[in-house]
Amino acid sequence: MRLFLSLPVLVVVLAMVLEGPAPAQAAPEISSTFERIPDKLKEFGNTLEDKARAAIETIKQSDIPAKTRTWFSETYNKVKERLKTAFS
């Protein structure tokens, strides 16, 4: 049953790929592409910076770091006590 469904989908995708790009999707000249690279990189860097700052602020304002430190401290102390009682 899956084969009957996947074959028509494969045929449609293959037809779309072989058809080629639409006129509006035609590749621009290589020189204009190279001219836009610095702007695109700057835009990417700014976007990445904004997202990183937002993520760091979210982490700073959340309780997760404090809870994690507390959990690790408690677990470490429990293991330490168990080892003390086991080897004394």
From Swiss-Prot:
Q: What is its main location?
A: secreted
Q: Which residues form the signal peptide?
A: 1-26
Instruction: Locate the transmembrane regions by residue number.
Output: none
User: Does this entry carry the keyword Secreted?
Assistant: yes
Annotated GO biological processes are: lipid transport; lipoprotein metabolic process; negative regulation of cholesterol transport; negative regulation of lipid catabolic process; negative regulation of very-low-density lipoprotein particle clearance; triglyceride metabolic process; very-low-density lipoprotein particle clearance
- Record keywords: Transport included? yes
Q: Which UniProt keywords apply?
A: Lipid transport, Secreted, Signal, Transport, VLDL
Annotated compartments: Secreted
Q: Name one GO molecular function term.
A: phospholipase inhibitor activity
Q: Which GO terms describe its cellular component?
A: high-density lipoprotein particle; very-low-density lipoprotein particle
Q: Tell me, what does this protein do in biology?
A: Inhibitor of lipoprotein binding to the low density lipoprotein (LDL) receptor, LDL receptor-related protein, and very low density lipoprotein (VLDL) receptor. Associates with high density lipoproteins (HDL) and the triacylglycerol-rich lipoproteins in the plasma and makes up about 10% of the protein of the VLDL and 2% of that of HDL. Appears to interfere directly with fatty acid uptake and is also the major plasma inhibitor of cholesteryl ester transfer protein (CETP). Binds free fatty acids and reduces their intracellular esterification.
Q: Which family does it belong to?
A: Belongs to the apolipoprotein C1 family.
Q: What is this protein called?
A: Apolipoprotein C-I
This chain is encoded by the gene named: APOC1
